[in-house]
Amino acid sequence: MGPSCPVFLSFTKLSLWWLLLTPAGGEEAKRPPPRAPGDPLSSPSPTALPQGGSHTETEDRLFKHLFRGYNRWARPVPNTSDVVIVRFGLSIAQLIDVDEKNQMMTTNVWLKQEWSDYKLRWNPTDFGNITSLRVPSEMIWIPDIVLYNNADGEFAVTHMTKAHLFSTGTVHWVPPAIYKSSCSIDVTFFPFDQQNCKMKFGSWTYDKAKIDLEQMEQTVDLKDYWESGEWAIVNATGTYNSKKYDCCAEIYPDVTYAFVIRRLPLFYTINLIIPCLLISCLTVLVFYLPSDCGEKITLCISVLLSLTVFLLLITEIIPSTSLVIPLIGEYLLFTMIFVTLSIVITVFVLNVHHRSPSTHTMPHWVRGALLGCVPRWLLMNRPPPPVELCHPLRLKLSPSYHWLESNVDAEEREVVVEEEDRWACAGHVAPSVGTLCSHGHLHSGASGPKAEALLQEGELLLSPHMQKALEGVHYIADHLRSEDADSSVKEDWKYVAMVIDRIFLWLFIIVCFLGTIGLFLPPFLAGMI
């Protein structure tokens, strides 16, 4: 053998050792097939197992045992005639909103569901004493329970959380959901209203012969409820029902939860009711405002516009329905009619206030009623007229011009006496004189003894030009007396207008008080306040 023999022997030995150490088919034959990234049955490689990885291997083995040949579309019953009993319960986390206009209630709830799946049972002793597993709900059969009275959004649960699986085959699944359920809103006592909203749950495809519901609790679980700032849950109970629909011959079970919720009225009381009451009280002040100020109509119209704005605000809040008018809407409508009536009454009062003798004659019944007895009933005291002075000639003059006419008469008498003295010194008697008796009559042509007799009787002899002057003075006095009488009649009309204002002042106060009582009394008697 040549020198290459040792090299050949060494190469042969290395090849034999390589064949002995390398497994048949190579390392690729021992490598497990790749699994999908989301495959729940996939498990980490043994080299990646942490300390205590034997438990994970046991769970992996249990998963393979449970879901080998499992069909998630078939009902979990041994026989097709068997019924799956689903225990159902509801837990509310938050009452998000109650939309009165669209008549919807938005809630955040947890649907508690529990049933038995005989295909998912195992013996804990065979699998490391594992008594429960959390499995994705997409891998197992779940009942198709939906919200029947859904108003918007998804009917079924959208967030598929994991289910809690027990060794006895019991499946416990509590998925969260946000539902918008339809609710018939009754706004009769708004904002002191109480609503009764329902949530109806049941299987959409399985009738009572396939799936039957059983309540976990008679009431809604409120342990995790987050209080709302607008609504308070008074009561929430569930009832089991079985109903036959027109579409199908089968009977379908359902569990209906009735939520009795009461509105917290503080916000609406501060921002709506109190301002409305204050504006309504301004209507009363319209009749206390004097007619001479000229702002009565302006105040009435301003109040009417303010109430119109409040009515528009309520229209945006309450649902657009013609079935019932809310109590606050009735109150505002009543107040608007009242304010409109006050405008009409104010126009009439202003018309009465500006009447005069040249345009109207006061009837006797108006003078007797509105100037006599009615003011006494309303506790109105009219100041008495000033005391009139008595004229020496018994002429009734106006108080304001009494002094002027008295002085004029006195001066005339002095002039007449002086003139008579002048004629007496000359030895003559005044050719033409007039006399003024105590009753205001003029006498002319008196002379001699007759004139002396007239003077003794208190009458005065006047010259012709003095007689004309005196007649002018009496004309002025009569005109002033006529103006004084007209002014007195005008004051009577103004007082009649004041009495009418006072009548409606008390009438509006009473009606406003009764309207306020009528606003709060019905909800109080109904137990909503």
Swiss-Prot record:
**Where is it predominantly found?**
membrane
Question: Where in this protein does the record put region Disordered?
Answer: 27-56
Keyword line? Cell membrane, Disease variant, Disulfide bond, Epilepsy, Glycoprotein, Ion channel, Ion transport, Ligand-gated ion channel, Membrane, Receptor, Signal, Synapse, Transmembrane, Transmembrane helix, Transport
Q: Name one GO molecular function term.
A: acetylcholine-gated monoatomic cation-selective channel activity
Query: How changing residue 376 to W affects the protein?
Result: In BFIS6; uncertain significance
A Pfam short name: Neur_chan_memb
Please list the disulfide bridges.
183-197, 247-248
Question: What disease is this chain connected with?
Answer: Epilepsy, nocturnal frontal lobe, 4: An autosomal dominant focal epilepsy characterized by nocturnal seizures associated with fear sensation, tongue movements, and nocturnal wandering, closely resembling nightmares and sleep walking. Seizures, benign familial infantile, 6: A form of benign familial infantile epilepsy, a neurologic disorder characterized by afebrile seizures occurring in clusters during the first year of life, without neurologic sequelae. BFIS6 inheritance is autosomal dominant.
- Subunit composition and interactions: Neuronal AChR is composed of two different types of subunits: alpha and non-alpha (beta). CHRNA2/alpha-2 subunit can be combined to CHRNB2/beta-2 or CHRNB4/beta-4 to give rise to functional receptors. Both CHRNA2:CHRNB2 and CHRNA2:CHRNB4 nAChR complexes are heteropentamers with two subtypes: LS (low agonist sensitivity) with a (CHRNA2)3:(CHRNB2/4)2 and HS (high agonist sensitivity) with a (CHRNA2)2:(CHRNB2/4)3 stoichiometries; the subtypes differ in their subunit binding interfaces which are involved in ligand binding.
The entry sums up its family as follows: Belongs to the ligand-gated ion channel (TC 1.A.9) family. Acetylcholine receptor (TC 1.A.9.1) subfamily. Alpha-2/CHRNA2 sub-subfamily.
Quote the function comment for this protein.
Answer: Component of neuronal acetylcholine receptors (nAChRs) that function as pentameric, ligand-gated cation channels with high calcium permeability among other activities. nAChRs are excitatory neurotrasnmitter receptors formed by a collection of nAChR subunits known to mediate synaptic transmission in the nervous system and the neuromuscular junction. Each nAchR subunit confers differential attributes to channel properties, including activation, deactivation and desensitization kinetics, pH sensitivity, cation permeability, and binding to allosteric modulators.
According to UniProt, the name of this protein is Neuronal acetylcholine receptor subunit alpha-2
Q: Which organism is it from?
A: Homo sapiens
Point out the gene that encodes the protein.
CHRNA2
